[in-house]
């Protein structure tokens, strides 16, 4: 099923509207770079600033551009269950291969509430693979391994989880509760290799928008058991992985992608541009990785 590098695409805007041409360019960059899948509408895509219709259109554009070459796994979670159900049904009907549903944010539900929330999503699309998106730093709550295990036993279409936390002990308990064949993806760029050494099958890393070949190769080496080769790539990618978080994601990501000519340097409020100091750090990082056009390097 799903494995390897599945880049979470940023949502490109131009004068406040979805820039479909830029989104298609991003798809081509990561697919031609060897990525094993594509995700749209996750944290990197600023979904909380978009209407459901905008999110649906982004899914349609990505599916059309990918054209079946790799799996597409949109983020379909929202705060309101009804919106999550609508967007998840839409993703399935549009032809996506699965969906990633974030732990509901802000309201800080208890574990029984989380179980019932994900159970309703799973019942609504019973033959559609679902990944739970565990991101306690944004959601304000973490879904417990026991809750995930319960969901996995009750709903076979809950096939995996994206883990966006530095807590590696969580993974050990997760595999014990949900099974060693549960599909875990790393959601923190610099922890891809550590998580894969514990049994994760890949990464959903924003860095792969900058360096798709390198991130895909790291995953391939780890999956093949070539941990020496994977370690070399881990250290090679470390600065880029850390740079994603020099400001709120996706601000650094979009800043560098704009210099690369792939999209406009534009976000939806309340996000805004980073500081000149961070921009200078990003410019030096991008130069070291060979990401900038020659004229930008000389500027």
UniProtKB/Swiss-Prot annotation:
EC number: 4.3.3.7
Localisation: Cytoplasm
Broadest EC class assigned to this enzyme: lyase
Signal peptide span: none
Catalyzed reaction equations: L-aspartate 4-semialdehyde + pyruvate = (2S,4S)-4-hydroxy-2,3,4,5-tetrahydrodipicolinate + H2O + H(+)
Gene Ontology biological-process entries: diaminopimelate biosynthetic process; lysine biosynthetic process via diaminopimelate
Organism: Thermus thermophilus (strain ATCC 27634 / DSM 579 / HB8)
SUPFAM superfamilies: Aldolase (SSF51569)
Protein task: Catalyzes the condensation of (S)-aspartate-beta-semialdehyde [(S)-ASA] and pyruvate to 4-hydroxy-tetrahydrodipicolinate (HTPA).
GO cellular component terms listed in the entry, alphabetical order: cytoplasm
Gene3D superfamilies: Aldolase class I
Name this protein carries in UniProt: 4-hydroxy-tetrahydrodipicolinate synthase
Active-site residue list: 133, 162
A UniProt-annotated Pfam family: DHDPS
Swiss-Prot/TrEMBL site (Part of a proton relay during catalysis) positions: 43, 106
The keyword Cytoplasm belongs to this UniProt entry's keyword annotation: yes
Binding site for pyruvate: 44, 204
Keywords: Amino-acid biosynthesis, Cytoplasm, Diaminopimelate biosynthesis, Lyase, Lysine biosynthesis, Schiff base
Alphabetized InterPro entries for the sequence: Aldolase_TIM, DapA, DapA-like, HpaI_NOT_DapA, Schiff_base-form_aldolases_AS
Molecular function terms, GO-annotated: 4-hydroxy-tetrahydrodipicolinate synthase activity
Metabolic or biological pathway: Amino-acid biosynthesis; L-lysine biosynthesis via DAP pathway; (S)-tetrahydrodipicolinate from L-aspartate: step 3/4
Homology family: Belongs to the DapA family.
NCBIfam families from the UniProt entry: dapA, HpaI-NOT-DapA
Subunit structure: Homotetramer; dimer of dimers.
């Amino acid at each position: 099923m799903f494995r390897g590098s599945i880049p979470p695409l940023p949502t490109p805007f131009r004068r406040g509207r979805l820039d479909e041409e830029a989104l298609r360019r991003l798809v081509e960059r990561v697919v031609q770079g060897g990525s094993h899948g594509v995700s749209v509408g996750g944290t990197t895509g600023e979904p909380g600033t978009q209407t459901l219709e905008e999110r649906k259109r982004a899914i349609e554009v990505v599916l059309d551009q990918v054209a079946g070459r790799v799996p597409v796994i949109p983020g379909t979670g929202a705060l309101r269950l009804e919106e999550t159900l609508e967007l998840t049904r839409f993703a399935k009907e549009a032809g996506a291969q699965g969906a990633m549903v974030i732990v509901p944010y802000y309201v800080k539900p208890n574990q029984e509430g989380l179980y019932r929330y994900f159970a309703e999503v799973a019942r609504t699309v019973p033959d559609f693979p679902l990944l739970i998106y565990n991101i306690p730093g944004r959601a304000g709550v973490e879904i417990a391994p026991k809750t995930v295990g319960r969901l996995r036993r009750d709903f076979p279409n809950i096939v995996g989880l994206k883990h966006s936390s530095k807590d590696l002990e969580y993974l050990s308990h997760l595999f014990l509760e949900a099974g060693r064949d549960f599909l875990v993806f790393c959601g923190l760029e610099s922890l891809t290799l550590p998580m894969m050494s514990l049994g994760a099958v890949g990464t959903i890393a924003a860095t792969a928008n900058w360096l798709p070949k390198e991130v895909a190769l790291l995953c391939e080496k780890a999956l093949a058991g070539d941990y020496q080769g994977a370690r070399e790539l881990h250290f090679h990618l470390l600065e880029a992985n850390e740079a994603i978080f020099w400001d709120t994601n996706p601000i650094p990501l979009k800043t560098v992608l704009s210099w690369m000519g792939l999209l406009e340097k534009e976000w939806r409020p309340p996000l805004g541009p980073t500081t000149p100091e961070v921009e200078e750090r990003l410019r030096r990082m991008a130069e070291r990785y060979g990401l900038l056009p020659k004229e930008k390097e000389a500027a």
